[in-house]
Amino acid sequence: MDFKIDFSKAFTVNQYLLTLLIAVGFLKLIASPKKEKNHLLPKGKQSFIKTYLSVHLFGSVINISSLLLVADKMYKKSPLNPAQIVLLTRAFASDAYWSPFFVAFAAAITYAPNLQTYTIISFGIFLAITAFMITYFDVTKDKKFNIDEFNGYPLSLETLYLPIILAILVLSTHYFFPNLKVIVLISTFSILMTLFILPLKKNFSEALKILKYHILNELPKMKSEISLFLVAGLFGILIGSVLTGLNFSLPFEVFDYKVASLLLLIFILLAFIGIHPIITIAMIGDFFVNANHTLLAMTFLMAWSTTVSTSPISGLNLTIVARYNCSAKEIFMLNIFYALKMYIVCVICLFVLSKYLNI
């Protein structure tokens, strides 16, 4: 047995992930949504669809800020009802399937750096659309959701052109300069766009004040998330070193859709007992260096999205429980069958992706 711990890697393995987490935070300074101008907000199915899209599309860029913005407005009127809880958890969590601005994508690209970005996003968007269709079917067919009386809070989508421009910049630059890491491009363009557009939307002195406030007040509030990812990297490398020293090897030769499906199930079960997906990813990442990185990354993203919406101890659900006086058990019961359906969809998707990649 030969135990060697790479302490340098332990503290730096998640540095790109942290860079993205901090850089994308600047986007909310220029891409924050506005309330729809229509004072008579629609009720029922139309309201559900518009609100779902609002949380999902803005959540893909400005992260949990979009969910809190909508949920705060809902909670002011009355306690969150089952339909609203389902919308908030699923609309936000399904961003993890595809959004390159989401921290889940950063985790995937950290441990599977050779992934095919376009393939991941394409399959991820399909999963996000499927998640919406399953959710919409659930709330319209089950009378307990009382969808005809649903009160939503749609947001104006006019500022969404900014992340679209950002995505075009990132993907086109990566196409011409494939050696540049996507995660570095997203981080760089996020800050550059903020520095360029904020003074155009406000005046220069106001933009300076907003930037100063964000750097001095908002960034320090991210200490919990940053600590989680630093500890995950450290813990993952230490566990990996121990397993390597014990001559641990994976019980399979080819990482195909069958192994990926089993790995996805393990991720989900571990998340339900409190082990964050980033911890599991960090622990096993080094053992999959020879696997197909696109299939591996897709498995990571599927695990992240499916568990975030359902696990009673995910960061998202703990926030909803604490902030809006909801029941963790209720959230779990509302989403557990959704998670099961999405797992089946994910397995089918892994099979198709595996065939597409000729594995």
Regions found by a protein language model. Give the residues of each.
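Hydrophobic transmembrane alpha-helices of multi-pass small-molecule transporters
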Residues: M1-Q15, T135-G240, N358-I359
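Membrane-embedded alpha-helical segments and adjacent helix-loop junctions characteristic
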Residues: D2-M74, L208-F288
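Alpha-helical transmembrane segments
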Residues: S8-L21, L53, Y118-A131, P178-M193, ...
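Alpha-helical transmembrane segments and their membrane-interface exit regions
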Residues: L18-K28, Y75-K77, L127-F137, F189-L200, ...
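Helix-loop-helix module between adjacent transmembrane segments
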Residues: S54-I62, L88-W98, F272, A303-S309
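Membrane-interfacial helix-loop connectors
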Residues: L69-P82, A106-T117, D256-S314, A322-Y324
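Membrane-core helix-loop-helix motifs of multi-pass transport proteins
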Residues: S78-P163, S172, L318-C349
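Juxtamembrane boundary at the C-terminal end of a transmembrane helix
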Residues: L350-I359
